[in-house]
Protein backbone atom coordinates (compact mmCIF):
# COMPACT_ATOMS: atom_id res chain seq x y z
CA UNK A 1 0.00 0.00 0.00
CA UNK A 2 1.36 3.40 -0.97
CA UNK A 3 1.40 5.82 1.95
CA UNK A 4 2.30 9.47 2.56
CA UNK A 5 3.55 10.15 6.08
CA UNK A 6 4.83 13.43 7.45
CA UNK A 7 7.89 12.88 9.60
CA UNK A 8 8.69 15.27 12.45
CA UNK A 9 12.23 16.54 12.72
CA UNK A 10 14.37 14.90 15.41
CA UNK A 11 15.64 17.00 18.28
CA UNK A 12 18.10 19.70 17.26
CA UNK A 13 20.47 22.12 19.00
CA UNK A 14 21.74 25.57 18.02
CA UNK A 15 19.17 25.79 15.17
CA UNK A 16 21.15 23.24 13.19
CA UNK A 17 19.93 19.94 11.82
CA UNK A 18 20.69 17.97 8.65
CA UNK A 19 19.30 14.62 7.61
CA UNK A 20 21.55 11.63 7.05
CA UNK A 21 19.23 8.73 6.23
CA UNK A 22 15.76 7.26 6.64
CA UNK A 23 15.21 3.54 7.25
CA UNK A 24 12.19 1.27 7.56
CA UNK A 25 12.59 -1.64 9.97
CA UNK A 26 10.04 -4.46 10.31
CA UNK A 27 8.55 -4.98 13.78
CA UNK A 28 6.33 -7.74 15.13
CA UNK A 29 4.43 -5.60 17.62
CA UNK A 30 4.19 -1.96 18.49
CA UNK A 31 6.73 -1.13 21.15
CA UNK A 32 4.27 0.74 23.35
CA UNK A 33 5.57 0.93 26.88
CA UNK A 34 3.26 0.10 29.79
CA UNK A 35 2.69 2.38 32.75
CA UNK A 36 3.98 1.05 36.05
CA UNK A 37 3.31 1.80 39.68
CA UNK A 38 6.61 2.90 41.22
CA UNK A 39 7.42 2.21 44.88
CA UNK A 40 10.62 3.01 46.80
CA UNK A 41 11.43 0.91 49.87
CA UNK A 42 14.15 1.60 52.43
CA UNK A 43 16.14 -1.45 53.58
CA UNK A 44 18.32 0.26 56.19
CA UNK A 45 18.25 -1.57 59.53
CA UNK A 46 20.43 0.60 61.76
CA UNK A 47 18.65 2.26 64.63
CA UNK A 48 20.16 5.70 64.07
CA UNK A 49 18.94 6.13 60.50
CA UNK A 50 17.07 9.40 60.12
CA UNK A 51 13.87 9.43 58.10
CA UNK A 52 15.15 12.31 55.97
CA UNK A 53 18.14 10.22 54.96
CA UNK A 54 16.22 7.18 53.79
CA UNK A 55 15.07 6.58 50.23
CA UNK A 56 12.59 9.13 48.95
CA UNK A 57 11.06 10.40 45.73
CA UNK A 58 10.60 14.15 45.34
CA UNK A 59 7.82 15.97 43.51
CA UNK A 60 9.76 15.76 40.24
CA UNK A 61 10.08 11.98 40.60
CA UNK A 62 13.81 12.01 41.42
CA UNK A 63 14.74 9.10 43.69
CA UNK A 64 17.44 9.59 46.34
CA UNK A 65 18.97 7.35 48.98
CA UNK A 66 22.10 7.00 51.07
CA UNK A 67 21.07 3.62 52.48
CA UNK A 68 20.23 0.21 50.99
CA UNK A 69 16.92 0.29 49.19
CA UNK A 70 14.99 -1.00 46.23
CA UNK A 71 12.83 0.62 43.58
CA UNK A 72 9.86 -1.46 42.44
CA UNK A 73 8.01 -1.24 39.12
CA UNK A 74 4.63 -3.00 39.25
CA UNK A 75 2.64 -3.65 36.06
CA UNK A 76 -1.01 -4.67 35.75
CA UNK A 77 -0.09 -7.19 33.05
CA UNK A 78 3.16 -9.10 32.42
CA UNK A 79 5.69 -6.85 30.71
CA UNK A 80 8.68 -8.03 28.68
CA UNK A 81 11.77 -5.94 29.37
CA UNK A 82 14.91 -6.15 27.23
CA UNK A 83 16.80 -3.08 28.38
CA UNK A 84 16.82 -0.45 31.09
CA UNK A 85 17.56 3.17 30.26
CA UNK A 86 18.90 5.14 33.23
CA UNK A 87 18.16 8.86 33.20
CA UNK A 88 20.08 11.07 35.62
CA UNK A 89 20.10 14.73 36.62
CA UNK A 90 23.87 14.68 36.99
CA UNK A 91 26.78 12.29 37.31
CA UNK A 92 25.81 9.37 39.56
CA UNK A 93 27.99 6.27 39.40
CA UNK A 94 25.84 4.39 41.92
CA UNK A 95 22.82 4.38 39.60
CA UNK A 96 24.66 1.89 37.39
CA UNK A 97 25.20 -0.63 40.21
CA UNK A 98 21.58 -1.76 40.51
CA UNK A 99 20.74 -5.45 40.93
CA UNK A 100 17.72 -6.27 38.76
CA UNK A 101 15.20 -8.80 40.11
CA UNK A 102 11.89 -9.96 38.61
CA UNK A 103 8.75 -11.63 39.94
CA UNK A 104 5.44 -12.90 38.62
CA UNK A 105 3.60 -12.61 41.93
CA UNK A 106 5.41 -9.88 43.87
CA UNK A 107 6.63 -12.42 46.44
CA UNK A 108 9.12 -14.75 44.79
CA UNK A 109 11.91 -12.92 42.97
CA UNK A 110 14.60 -14.17 40.60
CA UNK A 111 17.87 -12.50 39.65
CA UNK A 112 17.89 -11.00 36.16
CA UNK A 113 21.21 -9.15 36.10
CA UNK A 114 23.66 -7.19 38.21
CA UNK A 115 24.26 -3.98 36.28
CA UNK A 116 27.92 -3.10 35.71
CA UNK A 117 28.97 0.56 35.31
CA UNK A 118 30.95 1.52 32.26
CA UNK A 119 34.38 3.01 32.75
CA UNK A 120 33.41 6.62 32.30
CA UNK A 121 34.93 10.07 32.13
CA UNK A 122 34.05 13.07 34.22
CA UNK A 123 31.74 14.52 31.53
CA UNK A 124 29.42 11.54 31.60
CA UNK A 125 26.18 13.52 31.67
CA UNK A 126 25.70 14.23 27.97
CA UNK A 127 23.83 10.97 27.32
CA UNK A 128 21.65 8.46 29.15
CA UNK A 129 22.89 4.91 29.74
CA UNK A 130 21.07 1.86 28.37
CA UNK A 131 21.82 -1.49 30.04
CA UNK A 132 20.72 -4.57 28.11
CA UNK A 133 19.34 -7.50 30.12
CA UNK A 134 18.20 -11.02 29.20
CA UNK A 135 14.60 -10.75 27.89
CA UNK A 136 12.46 -10.99 31.01
CA UNK A 137 8.68 -11.15 31.26
CA UNK A 138 7.25 -10.31 34.68
CA UNK A 139 4.73 -8.14 36.50
CA UNK A 140 7.19 -6.92 39.12
CA UNK A 141 10.70 -5.58 38.60
CA UNK A 142 12.87 -4.56 41.53
CA UNK A 143 16.10 -2.61 41.37
CA UNK A 144 18.15 -3.18 44.51
CA UNK A 145 20.93 -0.83 45.57
CA UNK A 146 23.43 -0.87 48.41
CA UNK A 147 26.49 1.32 48.99
CA UNK A 148 28.41 -1.78 50.08
CA UNK A 149 30.95 -2.98 47.57
CA UNK A 150 31.25 0.41 45.91
CA UNK A 151 34.45 0.94 44.02
CA UNK A 152 36.64 3.23 46.17
CA UNK A 153 37.42 5.41 43.19
CA UNK A 154 39.13 4.01 40.16
CA UNK A 155 40.85 5.90 37.39
CA UNK A 156 38.69 8.30 35.31
CA UNK A 157 35.48 7.71 37.22
CA UNK A 158 35.20 10.83 39.35
CA UNK A 159 31.68 9.94 40.49
CA UNK A 160 32.88 6.59 41.84
CA UNK A 161 35.10 8.43 44.30
CA UNK A 162 32.31 10.40 45.91
CA UNK A 163 30.31 9.32 48.94
CA UNK A 164 28.02 6.54 47.67
CA UNK A 165 24.59 8.09 47.25
CA UNK A 166 21.90 6.96 44.85
CA UNK A 167 20.17 9.61 42.74
CA UNK A 168 17.99 8.61 39.77
CA UNK A 169 15.72 10.84 37.74
CA UNK A 170 14.02 8.01 35.89
CA UNK A 171 14.27 4.33 35.00
CA UNK A 172 12.81 3.50 31.60
CA UNK A 173 12.05 -0.15 30.87
CA UNK A 174 11.93 -0.97 27.16
CA UNK A 175 10.58 -3.89 25.14
CA UNK A 176 12.87 -3.49 22.14
CA UNK A 177 16.35 -4.96 22.04
CA UNK A 178 19.26 -2.54 22.26
CA UNK A 179 23.00 -3.03 22.41
CA UNK A 180 24.43 -2.79 25.90
CA UNK A 181 25.56 0.76 26.74
CA UNK A 182 25.20 1.74 23.09
CA UNK A 183 25.50 5.47 23.78
CA UNK A 184 29.20 5.15 24.52
CA UNK A 185 29.78 2.58 21.80
CA UNK A 186 28.25 4.96 19.23
CA UNK A 187 30.81 7.59 20.22
CA UNK A 188 28.30 9.95 21.81
CA UNK A 189 30.21 9.99 25.09
CA UNK A 190 33.51 8.64 26.51
CA UNK A 191 32.67 5.24 28.00
CA UNK A 192 34.14 1.74 27.98
CA UNK A 193 31.43 -0.85 28.60
CA UNK A 194 31.09 -4.60 28.54
CA UNK A 195 30.23 -6.21 25.21
CA UNK A 196 26.61 -7.17 24.61
CA UNK A 197 25.97 -10.82 25.44
CA UNK A 198 24.05 -13.18 23.15
CA UNK A 199 21.72 -14.18 25.98
CA UNK A 200 20.70 -10.50 26.14
CA UNK A 201 20.45 -9.83 22.41
CA UNK A 202 20.13 -13.00 20.37
CA UNK A 203 20.48 -13.54 16.65
CA UNK A 204 16.70 -13.30 16.34
CA UNK A 205 16.83 -9.77 17.82
CA UNK A 206 19.29 -8.49 15.19
CA UNK A 207 18.18 -7.00 11.89
CA UNK A 208 19.82 -8.39 8.77
CA UNK A 209 20.75 -5.99 5.98
CA UNK A 210 18.10 -7.55 3.77
CA UNK A 211 15.36 -6.68 6.29
CA UNK A 212 16.17 -2.97 6.46
CA UNK A 213 14.79 -0.75 3.68
CA UNK A 214 16.65 2.47 2.93
CA UNK A 215 14.10 5.20 2.13
CA UNK A 216 16.49 8.14 2.10
CA UNK A 217 15.79 9.01 -1.55
CA UNK A 218 12.03 8.69 -1.17
CA UNK A 219 11.15 11.55 1.11
CA UNK A 220 11.07 15.24 0.31
CA UNK A 221 11.75 18.42 2.22
CA UNK A 222 8.95 20.44 3.78
CA UNK A 223 9.19 23.60 5.84
CA UNK A 224 7.78 21.91 8.94
CA UNK A 225 9.25 18.46 8.53
CA UNK A 226 9.63 15.65 6.01
CA UNK A 227 6.99 13.74 4.11
CA UNK A 228 7.61 10.15 3.10
CA UNK A 229 5.78 8.79 0.09
CA UNK A 230 6.57 5.11 -0.35
CA UNK A 231 5.19 1.60 -0.75
CA UNK A 232 6.29 -0.85 1.92
CA UNK A 233 5.71 -4.61 2.03
CA UNK A 234 2.77 -5.85 4.08
CA UNK A 235 3.39 -5.83 7.82
CA UNK A 236 4.27 -3.46 10.66
CA UNK A 237 7.19 -1.11 10.14
CA UNK A 238 9.15 1.35 12.23
CA UNK A 239 10.60 4.43 10.54
CA UNK A 240 14.01 5.55 11.76
CA UNK A 241 14.94 9.08 10.69
CA UNK A 242 18.59 9.83 11.41
CA UNK A 243 20.29 13.20 11.23
CA UNK A 244 23.06 15.20 12.83
CA UNK A 245 23.01 18.34 14.94
CA UNK A 246 25.26 20.23 17.32
CA UNK A 247 25.89 18.56 20.66
CA UNK A 248 24.81 21.73 22.43
CA UNK A 249 27.84 21.34 24.69
CA UNK A 250 29.83 24.51 25.32
CA UNK A 251 33.21 24.85 26.96
CA UNK A 252 32.82 26.03 30.53
CA UNK A 253 36.26 27.26 31.58
CA UNK A 254 37.26 29.57 28.75
CA UNK A 255 36.19 32.90 30.22
CA UNK A 256 35.67 35.28 27.32
CA UNK A 257 36.11 32.40 24.89
CA UNK A 258 33.16 30.44 26.24
CA UNK A 259 30.95 28.91 23.58
CA UNK A 260 30.64 26.15 21.02
CA UNK A 261 33.66 24.25 19.74
CA UNK A 262 34.53 23.68 16.09
CA UNK A 263 33.99 20.49 14.10
CA UNK A 264 37.10 18.47 14.97
CA UNK A 265 36.85 16.35 11.79
CA UNK A 266 36.86 19.27 9.33
CA UNK A 267 40.20 20.97 8.54
CA UNK A 268 38.44 24.14 7.37
CA UNK A 269 36.60 24.67 10.66
CA UNK A 270 39.75 23.95 12.68
CA UNK A 271 41.64 26.47 10.55
CA UNK A 272 38.83 29.00 11.09
CA UNK A 273 38.98 28.58 14.85
CA UNK A 274 42.75 29.07 14.79
CA UNK A 275 42.52 32.14 12.53
CA UNK A 276 39.97 33.80 14.82
CA UNK A 277 41.78 32.84 18.01
CA UNK A 278 45.55 32.40 18.18
CA UNK A 279 46.34 34.08 14.85
CA UNK A 280 44.65 37.27 16.05
CA UNK A 281 47.63 37.92 18.31
CA UNK A 282 49.68 38.35 15.15
CA UNK A 283 47.00 40.13 13.12
CA UNK A 284 46.34 42.81 15.75
CA UNK A 285 49.96 43.53 16.67
CA UNK A 286 53.24 43.96 14.87
CA UNK A 287 53.65 40.45 13.39
CA UNK A 288 57.45 40.60 13.49
CA UNK A 289 57.42 41.48 17.18
CA UNK A 290 54.76 38.83 17.85
CA UNK A 291 56.94 36.15 16.24
CA UNK A 292 59.81 37.06 18.54
CA UNK A 293 57.65 37.15 21.67
CA UNK A 294 54.95 34.51 21.19
CA UNK A 295 56.72 31.15 20.98
CA UNK A 296 54.17 28.61 22.23
CA UNK A 297 50.64 27.61 21.28
CA UNK A 298 48.84 25.57 23.93
CA UNK A 299 45.68 23.43 23.74
CA UNK A 300 44.49 22.56 27.22
CA UNK A 301 42.71 19.40 28.38
CA UNK A 302 39.61 18.62 26.34
CA UNK A 303 36.50 19.57 28.35
CA UNK A 304 33.61 19.81 25.90
CA UNK A 305 32.06 16.42 25.30
CA UNK A 306 32.55 14.16 22.29
CA UNK A 307 31.72 14.15 18.57
CA UNK A 308 30.70 11.24 16.37
CA UNK A 309 29.63 12.68 13.02
CA UNK A 310 30.10 15.31 10.33
CA UNK A 311 29.24 15.55 6.64
CA UNK A 312 32.31 13.60 5.55
CA UNK A 313 32.39 11.01 8.31
CA UNK A 314 30.92 8.17 6.22
CA UNK A 315 33.41 8.91 3.43
CA UNK A 316 36.33 8.88 5.86
CA UNK A 317 35.00 5.71 7.44
CA UNK A 318 34.93 3.84 4.13
CA UNK A 319 38.40 5.09 3.23
CA UNK A 320 39.87 4.01 6.57
CA UNK A 321 37.89 0.84 7.34
CA UNK A 322 37.32 -0.45 3.81
CA UNK A 323 33.51 -0.84 3.84
CA UNK A 324 30.37 1.30 3.70
CA UNK A 325 28.96 2.40 7.06
CA UNK A 326 25.64 3.73 5.74
CA UNK A 327 23.70 0.41 5.63
CA UNK A 328 24.68 -0.13 9.27
CA UNK A 329 23.72 3.35 10.45
CA UNK A 330 20.90 2.09 12.76
CA UNK A 331 23.70 0.74 14.97
CA UNK A 332 24.37 4.36 15.99
CA UNK A 333 20.93 4.30 17.62
CA UNK A 334 21.77 1.10 19.47
CA UNK A 335 19.71 -1.13 17.14
CA UNK A 336 21.49 -4.50 16.75
CA UNK A 337 22.26 -5.72 13.23
CA UNK A 338 23.44 -9.07 11.83
CA UNK A 339 24.72 -10.31 15.23
CA UNK A 340 25.93 -8.81 18.49
CA UNK A 341 29.50 -9.68 17.53
CA UNK A 342 29.20 -7.91 14.17
CA UNK A 343 27.40 -4.97 15.77
CA UNK A 344 30.11 -4.51 18.39
CA UNK A 345 32.83 -4.74 15.72
CA UNK A 346 31.28 -2.08 13.49
CA UNK A 347 30.76 0.31 16.40
CA UNK A 348 34.37 -0.25 17.44
CA UNK A 349 35.34 0.74 13.89
CA UNK A 350 33.24 3.91 14.31
CA UNK A 351 35.10 4.83 17.49
CA UNK A 352 38.45 4.02 15.89
CA UNK A 353 37.61 6.35 13.00
CA UNK A 354 36.65 9.09 15.46
CA UNK A 355 39.94 8.75 17.33
CA UNK A 356 41.94 8.87 14.09
CA UNK A 357 40.12 11.94 12.76
CA UNK A 358 40.73 13.87 15.98
CA UNK A 359 44.46 13.36 15.46
CA UNK A 360 44.71 13.51 11.66
CA UNK A 361 42.54 16.61 11.33
CA UNK A 362 42.31 18.68 14.52
CA UNK A 363 45.79 18.13 15.91
CA UNK A 364 47.49 17.98 12.50
CA UNK A 365 45.98 21.30 11.38
CA UNK A 366 46.97 22.99 14.64
CA UNK A 367 50.48 21.54 14.40
CA UNK A 368 50.82 22.99 10.90
CA UNK A 369 49.47 26.36 12.08
CA UNK A 370 51.89 26.49 15.00
CA UNK A 371 54.79 25.77 12.68
CA UNK A 372 53.62 28.52 10.30
CA UNK A 373 53.97 31.05 13.13
CA UNK A 374 57.27 29.63 14.44
CA UNK A 375 55.60 28.37 17.62
CA UNK A 376 55.99 25.14 19.49
CA UNK A 377 52.77 23.20 19.94
CA UNK A 378 51.87 22.21 23.51
CA UNK A 379 48.83 20.06 24.31
CA UNK A 380 47.17 18.26 27.20
CA UNK A 381 44.88 15.20 27.24
CA UNK A 382 41.83 14.45 25.11
CA UNK A 383 40.72 11.57 27.36
CA UNK A 384 38.52 10.90 29.23
CA UNK A 385 36.11 13.22 27.38
CA UNK A 386 36.56 13.02 23.61
CA UNK A 387 36.29 9.44 22.35
CA UNK A 388 39.92 8.78 21.48
CA UNK A 389 43.17 6.93 21.87
CA UNK A 390 44.56 8.93 24.78
CA UNK A 391 48.16 8.68 23.53
CA UNK A 392 47.83 9.02 19.75
CA UNK A 393 47.56 12.82 19.51
CA UNK A 394 50.92 13.31 21.25
CA UNK A 395 52.66 12.33 18.01
CA UNK A 396 51.51 15.67 16.55
CA UNK A 397 52.59 17.96 19.40
CA UNK A 398 56.03 19.26 20.31
CA UNK A 399 55.40 19.44 24.04
CA UNK A 400 53.14 16.75 25.58
CA UNK A 401 51.41 17.79 28.80
CA UNK A 402 49.26 16.24 31.50
CA UNK A 403 47.95 17.45 34.84
CA UNK A 404 48.01 16.42 38.47
CA UNK A 405 45.85 17.64 41.33
CA UNK A 406 46.51 18.75 44.91
CA UNK A 407 44.33 17.49 47.79
CA UNK A 408 41.55 16.64 45.33
CA UNK A 409 41.20 12.85 45.18
CA UNK A 410 37.70 13.13 43.72
CA UNK A 411 39.08 14.90 40.65
CA UNK A 412 42.67 13.72 40.30
CA UNK A 413 43.19 11.33 37.39
CA UNK A 414 46.76 9.96 37.37
CA UNK A 415 46.23 8.66 33.84
CA UNK A 416 46.29 12.25 32.62
CA UNK A 417 49.97 12.29 33.53
CA UNK A 418 50.60 8.74 32.37
CA UNK A 419 49.06 9.48 28.96
CA UNK A 420 51.41 12.42 28.46
CA UNK A 421 54.47 10.58 29.78
CA UNK A 422 53.86 7.39 27.81
CA UNK A 423 52.91 9.33 24.69
CA UNK A 424 56.12 11.34 24.93
CA UNK A 425 58.19 8.19 25.34
CA UNK A 426 56.52 6.50 22.36
CA UNK A 427 56.91 9.46 20.02
CA UNK A 428 60.33 10.64 21.17
CA UNK A 429 59.40 13.93 22.88
CA UNK A 430 62.05 14.89 25.42
CA UNK A 431 60.15 17.66 27.24
CA UNK A 432 57.17 16.38 29.23
CA UNK A 433 55.08 19.06 30.90
CA UNK A 434 52.62 19.05 33.77
CA UNK A 435 49.86 21.36 34.88
CA UNK A 436 50.62 20.98 38.55
CA UNK A 437 48.69 21.42 41.80
CA UNK A 438 45.26 21.93 40.26
CA UNK A 439 42.83 21.97 43.17
CA UNK A 440 39.11 22.09 43.80
CA UNK A 441 37.51 23.59 46.91
CA UNK A 442 40.87 24.83 48.16
CA UNK A 443 41.16 25.53 51.88
CA UNK A 444 44.18 27.87 51.76
CA UNK A 445 46.36 25.42 53.67
CA UNK A 446 49.07 24.60 51.12
CA UNK A 447 52.74 25.01 52.03
CA UNK A 448 56.04 24.13 50.30
CA UNK A 449 56.66 20.80 52.06
CA UNK A 450 53.19 19.62 51.05
CA UNK A 451 53.82 20.60 47.44
CA UNK A 452 57.32 19.10 47.28
CA UNK A 453 56.24 15.51 47.95
CA UNK A 454 53.64 15.64 45.18
CA UNK A 455 56.03 17.32 42.76
CA UNK A 456 58.77 14.77 43.48
CA UNK A 457 56.39 11.92 42.72
CA UNK A 458 55.58 13.37 39.32
CA UNK A 459 59.23 14.06 38.54
CA UNK A 460 59.84 10.39 39.29
CA UNK A 461 56.99 9.41 36.96
CA UNK A 462 58.63 11.25 34.10
CA UNK A 463 57.75 14.95 33.89
CA UNK A 464 60.50 17.53 33.51
CA UNK A 465 58.67 20.86 33.14
CA UNK A 466 56.18 22.27 35.66
CA UNK A 467 53.37 24.76 35.09
CA UNK A 468 51.83 26.13 38.28
CA UNK A 469 48.06 25.92 38.46
CA UNK A 470 47.48 28.53 39.25
CA UNK A 471 49.84 31.52 39.19
CA UNK A 472 47.56 34.40 38.21
CA UNK A 473 48.36 38.04 37.59
CA UNK A 474 47.29 40.04 40.66
CA UNK A 475 46.81 43.71 39.70
CA UNK A 476 45.59 45.01 43.07
CA UNK A 477 47.65 46.42 45.90
CA UNK A 478 44.70 47.08 48.20
CA UNK A 479 42.72 43.83 48.06
CA UNK A 480 43.29 40.61 49.96
CA UNK A 481 43.77 37.84 49.04
CA UNK A 482 43.80 39.40 45.59
CA UNK A 483 43.15 37.65 42.32
CA UNK A 484 42.27 33.96 42.57
CA UNK A 485 40.32 31.54 40.41
CA UNK A 486 37.68 31.17 43.10
CA UNK A 487 38.31 27.78 44.74
CA UNK A 488 40.12 26.30 41.76
CA UNK A 489 43.88 25.92 41.85
CA UNK A 490 46.86 26.55 44.06
CA UNK A 491 47.07 29.90 45.89
CA UNK A 492 50.48 30.83 44.55
CA UNK A 493 51.02 34.59 44.39
CA UNK A 494 52.52 37.46 46.37
CA UNK A 495 49.75 37.55 49.00
CA UNK A 496 50.57 34.00 50.11
CA UNK A 497 51.94 34.20 53.68
CA UNK A 498 55.10 32.22 52.85
CA UNK A 499 55.67 33.93 49.50
CA UNK A 500 58.81 35.97 50.24
CA UNK A 501 61.01 33.07 51.32
CA UNK A 502 59.13 29.86 50.62
CA UNK A 503 58.07 30.55 47.04
CA UNK A 504 61.58 31.52 45.96
CA UNK A 505 63.16 28.45 47.55
CA UNK A 506 60.50 26.12 46.16
CA UNK A 507 60.76 27.55 42.65
CA UNK A 508 64.55 27.29 42.68
CA UNK A 509 64.29 23.65 43.77
CA UNK A 510 61.89 22.88 40.92
CA UNK A 511 64.14 24.68 38.45
CA UNK A 512 67.22 22.70 39.50
CA UNK A 513 65.38 19.38 39.32
CA UNK A 514 63.89 19.85 35.91
CA UNK A 515 67.02 21.41 34.44
CA UNK A 516 68.86 18.17 35.20
CA UNK A 517 65.94 15.98 34.13
CA UNK A 518 65.73 17.72 30.77
CA UNK A 519 69.35 16.80 30.04
CA UNK A 520 68.51 13.12 30.41
CA UNK A 521 66.64 10.65 28.25
CA UNK A 522 64.08 8.15 29.57
CA UNK A 523 65.00 4.50 29.82
CA UNK A 524 61.80 2.48 29.46
CA UNK A 525 62.15 -1.18 30.38
CA UNK A 526 58.56 -2.32 29.86
CA UNK A 527 56.13 -1.95 26.95
CA UNK A 528 52.45 -2.37 27.82
CA UNK A 529 49.82 -3.15 25.19
CA UNK A 530 46.89 -0.80 25.77
CA UNK A 531 44.49 -3.08 23.90
CA UNK A 532 42.24 -2.69 20.88
CA UNK A 533 39.26 -1.18 22.69
CA UNK A 534 38.38 2.44 21.93
CA UNK A 535 38.44 4.70 23.84
CA UNK A 536 41.68 3.68 25.52
CA UNK A 537 44.40 5.21 27.66
CA UNK A 538 47.86 4.44 28.99
CA UNK A 539 46.40 2.12 31.66
Which residues does each predicted region cover?
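Aromatic, loop-rich ligand-recognition surfaces of beta-strand-rich domains
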Residues: 56-108, 113, 127-202, 301
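Generic detection of short hydrophobic beta-strand segments and adjacent strand-loop junctions
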Residues: 115, 129-133, 213, 228-230
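Surface-exposed loop and turn segments in beta-propeller and other repeat-based domains
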Residues: 117-121
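Hydrophobic alpha-helical membrane-insertion signals
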Residues: 204-216, 277-280, 293, 300-306
Amino acid sequence: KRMAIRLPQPKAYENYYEDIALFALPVEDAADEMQAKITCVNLATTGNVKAAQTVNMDAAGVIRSSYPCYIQYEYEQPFTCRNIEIVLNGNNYQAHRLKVMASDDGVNYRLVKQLVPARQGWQNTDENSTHSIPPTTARFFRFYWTPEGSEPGSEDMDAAKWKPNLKIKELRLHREARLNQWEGKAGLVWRVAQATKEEEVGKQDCYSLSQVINLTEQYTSHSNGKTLTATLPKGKWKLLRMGHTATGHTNATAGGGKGLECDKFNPKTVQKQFDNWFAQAFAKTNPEVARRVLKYMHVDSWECGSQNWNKRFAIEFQKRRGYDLMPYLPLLAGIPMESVEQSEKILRDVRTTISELVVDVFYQVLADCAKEYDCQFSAECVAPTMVSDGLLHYQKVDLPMGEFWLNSPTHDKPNDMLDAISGAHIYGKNIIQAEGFTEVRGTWDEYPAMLKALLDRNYALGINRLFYHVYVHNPWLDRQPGMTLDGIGLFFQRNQTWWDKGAKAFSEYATRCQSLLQYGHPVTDIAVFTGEEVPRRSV
